[in-house]
Amino acid sequence: MEQRNENKTELKMIKMSDVQSQTVDWLWYPFIPYGKLTIIQGDPGDGKTTLILNIAARLSKGEGLDNDMKVTEPVNIIYQTAEDGLADTVKPRLELAEAVCERIMVIDETEKSLSMIDERLETAIKRTGARVLILDPIQAYLGGTMDMNRANEARDMTKRLSLLEEKYKCAILLIGHMNKAGGNKAAYRGMGSIDFLR
């Protein structure tokens, strides 16, 4: 008697003729799109956090990030950092950049650390209407059991984030550290699986 595989997934096919073409909506063309993941990575001390805080400050004021960027309106931003103190580092840097700090928010991790698959991310985006979510650095938000060197686990993490950004049309920026494998191309020096760089 043939046994049925209860876990078998039904095959579904999509014809490209049924797919409706869309244009990419850009936060900052051609660098940061809405509805997509963006990774900013570099060696320690390269100024990644300084760059991202200046981007956040300008967006909070509704300012363009370069001369060609259209200025529309100020946006709300969620900025999560695991490396810098909010009171002695992040806030002073934002004030120096003349940010509208009312528009830049942080999920409180006092009672429980945050991860990329934490349901609080979606709740925070819905509650604040944030158009930008920043996780600085990637490595701190993987969760205790995730191995970032395993391709399948990296894909699962980024897929969950992708669903969020597609659903809420926000931009998600991941800040990544480079490893010390000298001589390799930058894409392969990002710490963890190359699958973070989809």
Sequence positions of predicted segments:
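Interdomain "pre-motor" coupling segment immediately N-terminal to P-loop NTPase/helicase cores
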Residues: 1-3
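Conserved inter-motif catalytic segment of the P-loop NTP-binding fold
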Residues: 5-8, 14-16, 22-23, 27-29, ...
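Gly/Ala-rich phosphate-binding loop of Rossmann-like dinucleotide-binding domains
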Residues: 60
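Hydrophobic positions on the alpha1 helix immediately C-terminal to the Walker A/P-loop
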Residues: 51, 55
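Phosphate-binding/switch region of NTP-binding enzymes
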Residues: 39-40, 45, 49-50, 69, ...
